[in-house]
Every structure is written in structure tokens, then in C-alpha cells.
């Protein structure tokens, strides 16, 4: 199972580099077409007000990637990464994409993840490769 990921500060890139999974990095400069099943790993950068929360512009490449040639149709699940100290906007971008495209949110981790997070994502990818149904593994 391929991982498609976006990294702003390098934390998501560091996480993905610890896995033994094929991957592609989403770039604001390239149009990437996915013709195979993949998992999306995305950080969250959002703003929160009393009436609305939304992802900020730095996350536009992820939204553009998912829309490009209907890449979202090949996405089997979304994994969110962030910082729990941000409370209501923790993994917000992953939740927003999950709702927009009706793609399951399968896992979340903080920063560049732990060895247990790496193992869990590799296990999810293996299960999905075998056609298994998986559900969200971490409490929000």
C-alpha cells in the first residue's frame, strides 16, 4: 500500500521515512495522479474561532491533490498527525478531508510518531492490501 503524504515542517516526512512502505510526497508544485490504492497522511494547520474551524492555506496542496483527477477515489483511508495541545483543531485537516470525501479516518499520531505508530500504520497498510476492513484505531 502506497502512502501519499504532505509535510510542512518535516515531521510527517520523518514518520514516513521510518516505514517500509512505498510513498509519494505531495508537493505544491506538482500534479500527482494516483492510479492505485493509497493511504493519505496529513498534518493539520487550522484556525479556530467561536463559530468556525477551517484548514489554512498552507494545506491547499493536500486538498488540490485529493481533487486532482479524482485521486480521492483511490484513497482507502486517512491518517492525521498533529499536536494534541491544539485540542479542537488536532488532526482537523484529516477530519475535514474525511468528511468531504467520505473516506474513513483510520489513525492519528503526534509529531513524527513513535515506533508503535509506525508499526500500526504498517499493519493497517498490510490489512488493506489484503482487502480487510479496518476502523479507526486511536481515540480522539
From Swiss-Prot:
InterPro entries attached to this UniProt entry: Flavoprotein-like_sf, RNR_Ib_NrdI_bac, RNR_NrdI
Stretches of the chain forming a coiled coil according to its record: none
Gene3D superfamilies: 3.40.50.360
GO biological process terms, semicolon-separated: protein modification process
Pfam families: Flavodoxin_NdrI
GO MF terms held by the record: FMN binding
Family: Belongs to the NrdI family.
Biological function: Probably involved in ribonucleotide reductase function.
Name of the molecule in the record: Protein NrdI
Source organism of this protein record: Lactococcus lactis subsp. lactis (strain IL1403) (Streptococcus lactis)
GN (gene name): nrdI
Amino acid at each position: 500500500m502506497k502512502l501519499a503524504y504532505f509535510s510542512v515542517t518535516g515531521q510527517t516526512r520523518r514518520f514516513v521515512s521510518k516505514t517500509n512502505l512505498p510513498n509519494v510526497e505531495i508537493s505544491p508544485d506538482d500534479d500527482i495522479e494516483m492510479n492505485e490504492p493509497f493511504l493519505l497522511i496529513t498534518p493539520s494547520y487550522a484556525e479556530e474561532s467561536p463559530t468556525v474551524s477551517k484548514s489554512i492555506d498552507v494545506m491547499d496542496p493536500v486538498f488540490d491533490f485529493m481533487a486532482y483527477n479524482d485521486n480521492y477515489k483511490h484513497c482507502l483511508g486517512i491518517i492525521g498527525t498533529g499536536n494534541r495541545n491544539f485540542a479542537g483543531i488536532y488532526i482537523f485537516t484529516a477530519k475535514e478531508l474525511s468528511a468531504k470525501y467520505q473516506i474513513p479516518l483510520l489513525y492519528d499520531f503526534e509529531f513524527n510518531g513513535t515506533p508503535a505508530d509506525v508499526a500500526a500504520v504498517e499493519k493497517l497498510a498490510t490489512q488493506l492490501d489484503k482487502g480487510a476492513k479496518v476502523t479507526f484505531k486511536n481515540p480522539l
